Design a protein with these regions (language model features):
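A non-transmembrane, solvent-exposed segment enriched in polar/low-complexity residues
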Residues: 1-139
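Extended amphipathic alpha-helical segments with heptad-repeat/coiled-coil character used for oligomerization
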Residues: 141-186
């Protein structure tokens, strides 16, 4: 499956050689995701650009295999050509860069203003970690800061659901049952 952020998944049809071709119009630089088996490959698309992706299925399955994961790697899992090739390669290098996120256990009994302050703190911590990371390029750091802002936006827009989930988790209830009794603290 292939999907650009915020768009519907597109199922890809492979030819007999295992190749596919598709076009995905974007009006601005957008992160897209290619799902192959249980793995997800993220990459940047730009208007008017072309991106070629070669997936090394042999390596991808070796790396996720319990029996063969310690065997010698057989190349990279994915190769990129075309516009943003270097940045896309860096995005899939395996380096973990955490973005703004919350822990439900921390949210219990927070009111919306406390939640906003908590999210802003998590956002600032992630932003500092991105810029302090000397293993990534300036272009990748800039992309990550945009994605970090997007993560913050999603958390702030969904504050009511996040607080409800935290309440449900703390009380051992389903979200549906929790929604019947939950009231945001003032």
């Amino acid at each position: 499956f292939l999907s650009a952020y915020g768009q519907k998944n597109t199922e890809l049809k492979l030819d007999e050689a295992g190749n596919f071709h598709t076009e995905m119009p974007v009006s601005h630089p957008s992160v897209a995701y290619l799902s192959v088996g249980g793995s997800v490959i993220s990459f940047l698309l730009s208007p008017g650009g072309e991106t070629k992706i070669t997936v090394n299925l042999r390596e991808m399955t070796r790396a996720s295999s319990r029996l063969r994961k310690d065997a010698k790697p057989e190349g990279k899992k994915v190769y990129f050509e075309g516009l943003n090739a270097g940045l896309n390669t860096e995005m899939n290098s395996g380096l973990e860069i955490p973005l703004c996120s919350v822990e439900l256990k921390d949210l219990y009994d927070m009111n919306p203003d406390q939640y906003k302050a908590y999210c802003m703190q998590k956002y600032e911590e992630a932003d500092k970690a991105i810029y302090a990371n000397k293993k990534i390029s300036k272009a990748y750091a800039e992309l990550l800061t945009v994605l970090n802002k997007d993560a913050l936006y999603g958390l702030l827009c969904g504050y009511d659901y996040q607080l409800l989930q935290a309440y449900a988790q703390q009380k051992g209830l389903s979200v549906r049952d929790a929604s019947k009794e939950y009231r945001s603290p003032e």
